[in-house]
Swiss-Prot record:
Gene that encodes the chain: CTSB
Protein name as it appears in the record: Cathepsin B
Species whose genome carries this gene: Pongo abelii (Sumatran orangutan)
Active-site residues, Swiss-Prot/TrEMBL: 108, 278, 298
EC number: 3.4.22.1
Disulphide connectivity of cysteines: 93-122, 105-150, 141-207, 142-146, 179-211, 187-198
An example Gene Ontology molecular-function term: collagen binding
Chief place of localization: other
Amino acid sequence: MWQLWASLCCLLALADARSRPSFHPLSDELVNYVNKRNTTWQAGHNFYNVDVSYLKKLCGTFLGGPKPPQRVMFTEDLKLPESFDAREQWPQCPTIKEIRDQGSCGSCWAFGAVEAISDRICIHTNAHVSVEVSAEDLLTCCGSMCGDGCNGGYPAEAWNFWTRKGLVSGGLYESHVGCRPYSIPPCEHHVNGSRPPCTGEGDTPKCSKICEPGYSPTYKQDKHYGYNSYSVSNSERDIMAEIYKNGPVEGAFSVYSDFLLYKSGVYQHVTGEMMGGHAIRILGWGVENGTPYWLVANSWNTDWGDNGFFKILRGQDHCGIESEVVAGIPRTDQYWEKI
C-alpha cells in the first residue's frame, strides 16, 4: 500500500513541476508571467547580462545551520503597532537607512549581521555611538567557524564571533571609513550602469589585523563587542517584539529566481528555480493593501528593488523568512568611558 502511495506522490510532484512554466531567471517572459498573475508585487529588470553563477553566489547563506539558544521573551503585555519602521523610530541612527553592496561575493551572511549590529550599537547607546561595523573583518577573520567566506556562511556564527572576538569598524568600498572598509568592489549587476561586469568568481580576501593607513585607533582598540547573541523564535509576534524593543535583526530565507526581479509591493514566490539561501536585515513590518509584510534591507546596492529595500509576506514563514532570525545585544559598557 505504501508503495502505491509513494508512487502517487511522485506522480503528483512530477505533474506539478511540469505544470509550472520554466523561464530563464532574468527573462522578459518571467517578468511578464509574474505581472500577469496580478499578485501582491511587481516584477521588473534589476540585473542585466550577468552570469547565473553570479546570481547564485549572491545567495551565500547556509540555511538550517547551527543556532544559538533562543532568548525567552515575555511579550503578552507589549502593545505592538500595526506598522513599524526602524528608520522612523530611530532617525538619529544613520546606518538603519543604509544599503550596502556585497559585490561578487556570497557574503550576505556577514552583511546582514554587521548591518543589524551597527544599528543596535546606535540604538542601545541612545545614538551616542554611530559606527559602521566592518563586513570585511567578519567575512575574512571568522574563518571556518562561520562557513566558507565568499562561498557562504552561517548567520548565527557571525553573531557569535561578534560576542567572542569583536568586530572593527569599516564602511563601504573605497569609502576610507573606519578601520577595515569593504575591499570587494561593487559590480554592474544592474541595468544601464557604469560599474565593471559581475561574475560568479571571487576569492575571499585575507584576514588582516591592521587598520588601513591613516586610521586610528589600532585594530585591537577599534573592536566592538556583543554582550550576547541568540535566536528569535519563528513566532511572528516574537520577531516583531524583538525589533520593536532592540532594533533590526538578521534573517535568512530561500531565494527563487522570481525574487531577483522584485521592484515593489509585497513579495510572494510565484515561480522560478531555487537559487539558494540569502541573509538580510529585517527592520520593520506593516500591511499593504491588506497583505501583512516584513520590511527588509537587502545588500545588492540601491538600484535593486525598492531603493535596495523590499517587502515580503509576513506571518506564514514564507520561504522560511521567520525560521532563521538571529540577533544580539551590544556590550555598551565599552562605550560609556568614551562618551
